[in-house]
């Protein structure tokens, strides 16, 4: 992520509740979305060195369930957020400012499904 420091400070950077494990990237994007950021640039030609959780693999650290954490925090899972808010993984979707998602029947039913999952996990917590 390449984010201006003022914006990073405004949204609070990565949330500790998603560390260690997964979910910190979609959480940061959701916090940016909630702060009215609508321009997300994807760069297709770059090198990334990812060491595949080398720290957590060597120790007895219990990983979080990022999908569950995200669901409990925002009321829907990261897949739903990526699909309807960030318009999926297609780089051609990122040519202009993103707009609020348009509610379709499919989106509505997926949102209802997410809400059932949310209440299920809330009851179990």
Which residues are covered by each model-predicted region?
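Histidine-centered active-site/metal-ligand motif
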Residues: 49-50
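C-terminal, non-catalytic tails of nucleotide-sugar-dependent glycosyltransferases
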Residues: 2, 39-40, 54-125
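A short, conserved alpha-helix in the catalytic core of glycosyltransferases
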Residues: 1-12, 17-46
